[in-house]
């Protein structure tokens, strides 16, 4: 990879994605800031990003990309490659929170959540990997969450979407190890971003009402989380450090959080268990799994 990367980011209209875009571009990295409907629902956000890029001479290009639509993903990736000649880093950031007692979440709600939080990165990775394979280099960054390692009541479906993302991203890290392509998982704790201003809640009120006082659990969880929020720029700075880390030196997981949820301990144990499993399966050499590079901090 060259020192300045070409980076494609999903969900760039607000929140972490917007911060990642600004932080990376200000360090000279070319950023393709993607979002749904930049000429529609996100027209204001897209205009703000373009205006900022022009005002500060930042290498930012806004593209339309809906992670739930295969054709939309393919068009955006093709447009980025046509413009820049390559994609060095894909940051799978688009996602949302679904909160509520698990029984109150409908099947349709669960399907929509997984289509964005899990299948979205599946689509993006499938679109960028042929280009990265031709380059013999690339980084897939998956924005997971502490909720990808721990479970809170009323967050079961959101946790499930992030658990799925982590399993998929870790499998990719083994499978791509010999091709010069790295798969990285970033696990932010609780940070004050717009994602919690647009939380979707379980739609089946009749089911929720059968829980009596326990119906208040989702509100209690959100209150507890919001009382310990950190500065989201910490996560953007971590992303910058990961992007600028030399090839082959990145770790599989990075936990970035103002709270101690025990995620580092879970990751350390998982690292050892996974190393043992790969060794037992006779796959350690095939996957080039390095015990010392499974988890870390930035």
Model feature map: region roles:
Residues 145:
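Residue(s) in the substrate-gating loop at a strand-loop-helix junction
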Residues 125, 161:
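Active-site helix of classical SDR
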Residues 101-102, 109-111:
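Substrate-binding pocket helix/loop in short-chain dehydrogenase/reductase
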Residues 56-59, 79-92, 98:
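A glycine-rich helix->loop->beta "capping" turn
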Residues 64-75, 107:
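The beta1-alpha1 cofactor-binding region of Rossmann-like NAD(H)/NADP(H)-dependent oxidoreductases
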Residues 2-36:
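Canonical Rossmann dinucleotide-binding motif of NAD(H)/NADP(H)-dependent dehydrogenases/reductases
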Residues 175, 179-225:
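C-terminal beta-strand-loop-alpha-helix "lid" module of Rossmann-like NAD(P)-dependent dehydrogenases
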């Amino acid at each position: 990879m060259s020192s300045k990367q070409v980076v494609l980011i999903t969900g760039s209209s607000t929140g972490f994605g917007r911060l990642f875009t600004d932080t990376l571009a200000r360090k000279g990295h070319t950023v393709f800031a993607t979002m749904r409907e930049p000429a529609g629902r996100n027209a204001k956000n897209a205009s703000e990003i373009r205006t900022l890029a022009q005002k500060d001479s930042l290498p930012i290009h806004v593209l339309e990309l809906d992670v739930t639509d295969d054709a939309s993903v393919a068009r955006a990736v093709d447009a980025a490659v046509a413009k820049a000649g390559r994609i060095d880093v894909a940051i799978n950031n688009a996602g949302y929170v679904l909160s509520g007692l698990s029984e109150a979440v409908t099947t349709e709600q669960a399907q929509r959540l997984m289509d964005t939080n899990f299948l979205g990165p599946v689509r993006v990775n499938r679109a960028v990997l042929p280009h990265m394979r031709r380059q013999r280099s690339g980084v897939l960054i998956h924005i997971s969450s502490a909720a990808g390692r721990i479970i809170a009541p009323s967050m079961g479906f959101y946790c499930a979407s992030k658990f799925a993302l982590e399993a998929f991203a870790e499998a990719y890290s083994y499978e791509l190890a010999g091709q010069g392509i790295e798969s990285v998982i970033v696990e932010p704790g609780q940070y004050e971003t717009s994602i919690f201003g647009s939380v979707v809640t379980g739609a089946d009120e009749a089911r929720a009402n059968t829980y009596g006082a326990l119906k208040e659990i989702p509100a209690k969880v959100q209150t507890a989380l919001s009382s310990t929020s950190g500065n989201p720029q910490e996560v953007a700075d971590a992303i910058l450090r990961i992007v600028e880390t030399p090839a082959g030196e990145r770790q599989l997981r990075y936990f970035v959080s103002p709270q101690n949820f025990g995620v580092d301990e879970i990751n350390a144990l998982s690292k050892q268990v996974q190393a043992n499993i790969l060794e037992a399966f006779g796959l350690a050499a095939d996957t080039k799994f390095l015990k010392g590079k499974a988890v870390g901090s930035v």
